[in-house]
């Protein structure tokens, strides 16, 4: 038996190699294989959003004006979700709903599914871009792992939550005021602020902001005074290899302030990565729970006592009444097709009224 030793040579004109060479070439804007997913999806998502907020009404889906053409501004314009009657239809332009009619497709809310799906794949493409570049320059993939947090939140809020409900109608519309209304909806129908996963998300995001501020200030405070420039930006050569701040001094300072301090940079920066990403993942898990209508904390004993004793009230019972008011107002406004009528006697009243 003969064993051939040596490197296997492929045809130099192999199509894959030609594509790989062109896609991964060093240029001003790196393309890469991930760019085949990222750039088209990001282009279509942004293009669909700009088109919808500029021209497309929400009269047929929500009974609202939602475009610049109708008098909205940047804060009130939105690409609105499809009507509740369309359930979870993908609303393809060539599908049975629009039948290739672009105007009808826009009226039905087709731009929302278009933006949501292309946006999700665009974000995934951006994460793959970070993986690809990290591999090319031999870095660890922690940037891509960190970016999984925002992707998890986007997918859970815009896709998984409405999939758990009766249709895309209950997802957020793509607009500033529309997102605010969705937040109020989450509070009224799910008591979201009392959900422990939301609490972890808030702790992660605000904790990360605090860590960022502390870290930036500490590094600025402990910069070496070895430059000749008039300020921080001119004092150092951007390509210098040596360290420009003192970790030892920073450790001594925070040890005196708190009694404890990070002893090395790896643990410090891993903690700065861990806090926000874990918070985002926890909030995404919480939204998945809401998609299934899971309850969070219900302090029933306080509700019963407040109902029996006019003089007993807690911040929790006040918030529950507020949630009932949100539901009574929003349900009738957002779902007129349900013909919801709430008589005066069933509307919530606090013990003080």
Curated annotation (Swiss-Prot):
Residues annotated as transmembrane: 41-61, 125-141, 153-166, 208-228, 279-295
Any GO MF annotation of the entry: chlorophyll binding
Cofactor binding comment, as recorded: The D1/D2 heterodimer binds P680, chlorophylls that are the primary electron donor of PSII, and subsequent electron acceptors. It shares a non-heme iron and each subunit binds pheophytin, quinone, additional chlorophylls, carotenoids and lipids. There is also a Cl(-1) ion associated with D1 and D2, which is required for oxygen evolution. The PSII complex binds additional chlorophylls, carotenoids and specific lipids.
Gene Ontology CC entries for this record: chloroplast thylakoid membrane; photosystem II
Signal sequence extent: none
Top-rank EC class of the record's enzyme: oxidoreductase
UniProt xrefs under Gene3D superfamilies: Photosystem II protein D1-like
Subcellular location: Plastid, Chloroplast thylakoid membrane
Modification Phosphothreonine occurs at: 2
Listed PROSITE patterns: REACTION_CENTER
Positions bearing N-acetylthreonine: 2
Annotated EC: 1.10.3.9
Residue numbers binding chlorophyll a PD2: 198
Protein residues bound to pheophytin a: 130, 143
Major localisation: plastid
Keyword Thylakoid recorded: yes
Keywords tagged on the record: Acetylation, Chlorophyll, Chloroplast, Chromophore, Electron transport, Iron, Magnesium, Membrane, Metal-binding, Oxidoreductase, Phosphoprotein, Photosynthesis, Photosystem II, Plastid, Thylakoid, Transmembrane, Transmembrane helix, Transport
Residues annotated to bind Fe cation: 215, 269
UniProt cross-references to SUPFAM superfamilies, sorted A to Z: Bacterial photosystem II reaction centre, L and M subunits (SSF81483)
UniProt entry tagged with the keyword Repeat: no
Binding site for chlorophyll a ChlzD2: 118
Subunit structure: PSII is composed of 1 copy each of membrane proteins PsbA, PsbB, PsbC, PsbD, PsbE, PsbF, PsbH, PsbI, PsbJ, PsbK, PsbL, PsbM, PsbT, PsbX, PsbY, PsbZ, Psb30/Ycf12, at least 3 peripheral proteins of the oxygen-evolving complex and a large number of cofactors. It forms dimeric complexes.
NCBIfam families according to UniProt: psbD (TIGR01152)
Note: 2 of the reaction center chlorophylls (ChlD1 and ChlD2) are entirely coordinated by water.
Protein name listed in UniProt: Photosystem II D2 protein
